[in-house]
């Protein structure tokens, strides 16, 4: 009977996700124009000019989002010698039908430098005027951070080569995808953070860095046009990383792909890592048994998705909501308790959710600090650990854990996914609260270890109560001493904070450690 209950969740999920048969009825599709470069365009400067033109059209608010996404697809397909084959392999989609037009150069034409839009059968004059004669709202200077004020297209192509310059634009579109779907508020900051690595290794030149506004516009297109996201994901799936002939652009796409994989599934994988893989005795609790069974069913569901499993959130797979931590709250709360002790970086992770089980959260912290729970008997036998070494290790672990016996409090709120995604707060922008006629405190605001603030300038009751009594007393004493010094100092002095002596600084650092 118990085994039947254990497998019920998995069988139930299987019945929900599997097909019941029946005819597949096609839905409505958008027809989207894709532009590819024909064999008559051989000049690298012309190719780079067209790449920037595609990007400009994709940022034109006068066009529909579907067509703006089409211009981004046109840009991405320029990385391949055969754009038609690329779209055939990766562009199959239930929402759009791609119509490919070729851009050729006709020596007999003077207008638009001889560039013309055509197919094998005919020339499209109106499309040519629409493509090259449009008064774009977004010109090529505004969409780049530096506006190409120091370098022309010819200079960049001559110095770095066309493939390198094209790759700089394409890789930035891929970086935008990392945050465009799963973390809208952190898009701009996340983009420039990840871009920095590509700037340092020379992949992206400073003259070709997209502006912040352009980044947000492209992110908006990705959110509204799932067909574009699907194409990019299929590109990652079908790209054979085992090949020895990957181009530099393809290698860089794979690097960015590592950030895209499993995006939006952080809670699921953190629960497995800190809740299950640590294999502590708390897993035997009956309270956690239902959530463990639920997690087992989710793991089987994840594996059943095959190569598309890491992208279920990016692709908005109907089952991606099943992986939310609210579906296994007790186990997630326990895992987060273990995480904030074992990994200091996890203390920035937002755990203050409505479904947080505070008792399991504290239990996770308690067992993570316990030396006995952290030792694996299986590894002890495999490594041949002696009893003396085992006792010595226990002693060291107890000494370390005894220095911090207080429980970490939940951080953040339910509306924020990751605290690290928020904009860094500038200390000078924050002033002390109104203190009436009392002099303003000179203590640096960010010196208080337990004080946190949200970007909306609000503080919860929990955050205010988290300031320890000892810290309050130290702050009052330091403020009193500083105020006494103000009264004794020269009235003409305009910068009293610079007169703080070394004793006061030592007091502050001794009170808060090395924060």
Curated annotation (Swiss-Prot):
Outline the segment boundaries, as ranges, of region: Interaction with the phosphoprotein. 457-466
For this protein, the record's InterPro entries field holds: Paramyx_ncap
**Predominant location:** virion
Provide the Gene Ontology terms for cellular component: helical viral capsid; host cell cytoplasm; ribonucleoprotein complex; viral nucleocapsid
Q: Does the keyword DNA-binding apply?
A: no
Per UniProt, what is one GO molecular function of this protein? RNA binding
Identify the domain of life: Viruses
Instruction: Tell me yes or no: is Cytoplasm among this UniProt entry's keywords.
Output: no
UniProt binding sites for RNA: 179, 189, 194, 259, 349, 353
Signal peptide residues on this chain, from the entry's feature table: none
Question: Partners and quaternary state?
Answer: Homomultimer; forms the nucleocapsid. Binds to the viral genomic RNA. N0 interacts with the phosphoprotein (via N-terminus); this interaction allows P to chaperon N0 to avoid N polymerization before encapsidation. Interacts as N-RNA template with the phosphoprotein (via C-terminus); this interaction positions the polymerase on the template.
Its domain description in UniProt is:
Ncore is globular and carries regions required for self-assembly and RNA-binding. Ntail is an intrinsically disordered monomeric domain in the C-terminus.
Name recorded for this polypeptide: Nucleoprotein
Give the originating organism.
Bovine parainfluenza 3 virus (BPIV-3)
The organism's taxonomy opens as: Viruses, Riboviria, Orthornavirae, Negarnaviricota, Haploviricotina
- Encoding gene (name): N
